[in-house]
């Protein structure tokens, strides 16, 4: 049974690879035998992370700087990584994302909305396109989006209209592509709840206290509690699973 979860000899690319969730996924996938490409924006820690994966797990691992909101850059970087990591792409994880609190009525700065949409939604779509060409040529592949519980409900008390909207769109994009790409790829998503990463660092103690109060497990999740869902969706254990979304939120959406 455990062999169904093996990724030995496969290649995985992860956008947002220098973040808490992205690197946690990378560690789990490398431990399962996958070569790993980390696509990152500005955080050059991805270079150190790639070296760590190579040294600890003996897999191929490289880091690539890539502005995820730039379609041409995403496609070019994906093609480069595929060529350098073995010539095929088995798993693509569209994980890059940002959240910027803003007042939807009072905030007249359109730059916030445009930036969040550019990274969270456009970037996810460009990532899918880049991977889809390889999957179609190969006749097989697994695309996994990092959505959010914010795509299911509107978080409170923070005001994240742009984040909520983009993550709901990403979740439905996954379902749409699962239908369109059924002949050659599986497409699914994972919806994390409140996870202790750089994305939530802005929150003061009062806000974090509210998050815990609203979560049935009464705590904020850790990045290392997420990779199991991604590993399942990437592996042969989920060969008949497409168009699904796995919520990992400590029970938040079940209240």
UniProtKB/Swiss-Prot annotation:
CDD domains, alphabetized: MDH-like_SDR_c
Superkingdom as given in the UniProt entry: Eukaryota
Classification via InterPro entries: NAD(P)-bd_dom_sf (IPR036291), SDR_fam (IPR002347)
GO MF terms, alphabetically ordered: oxidoreductase activity, acting on the CH-OH group of donors, NAD or NADP as acceptor; sorbose reductase activity
Pfam families: adh_short_C2
UniProt keyword terms in alphabetical order: Carbohydrate metabolism, NADP, Oxidoreductase
One GO CC term on file: mitochondrion
Similarity comment: family membership: Belongs to the short-chain dehydrogenases/reductases (SDR) family.
Descriptive protein name: Sorbose reductase sou1
Species this protein is from: Schizosaccharomyces pombe (strain 972 / ATCC 24843)
Gene this chain is encoded by: sou1
């Amino acid at each position: 049974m455990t062999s169904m979860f093996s990724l030995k000899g496969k290649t995985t690319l992860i956008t947002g690879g220098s973040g808490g969730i992205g690197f946690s996924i990378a560690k789990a996938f490398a431990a399962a035998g996958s070569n790993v490409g980390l696509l990152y924006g500005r955080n050059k820690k991805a270079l150190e992370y790639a070296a760590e994966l190579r040294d600890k797990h003996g897999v191929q691992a490289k880091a690539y700087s890539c502005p995820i909101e730039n379609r041409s850059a995403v496609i070019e970087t994906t093609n480069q990584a595929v060529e350098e990591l073995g010539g095929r792409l088995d798993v693509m994880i569209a994980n890059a994302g940002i959240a910027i609190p803003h007042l939807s009525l009072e905030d007249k700065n359109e730059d916030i909305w445009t930036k969040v949409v550019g990274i969270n939604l456009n970037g996810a779509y460009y990532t899918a396109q880049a991977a889809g060409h390889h999957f179609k040529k190969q006749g097989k592949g697994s695309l996994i989006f990092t959505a959010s519980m914010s795509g299911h409900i509107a978080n409170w008390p923070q005001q994240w209209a742009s984040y909520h909207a983009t993550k709901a769109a990403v979740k439905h994009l996954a379902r749409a592509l699962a239908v369109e790409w059924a002949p050659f790829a599986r497409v699914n998503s994972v919806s994390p709840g409140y996870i202790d990463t750089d994305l939530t660092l802005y929150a003061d103690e009062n806000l974090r206290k509210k998050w815990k109060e609203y979560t049935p497990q009464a705590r904020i999740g850790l990045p290392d509690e997420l990779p199991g869902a991604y590993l399942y969706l990437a592996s042969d254990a989920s060969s008949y699973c497409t168009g699904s979304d796995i919520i990992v939120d400590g029970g938040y959406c079940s209240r």
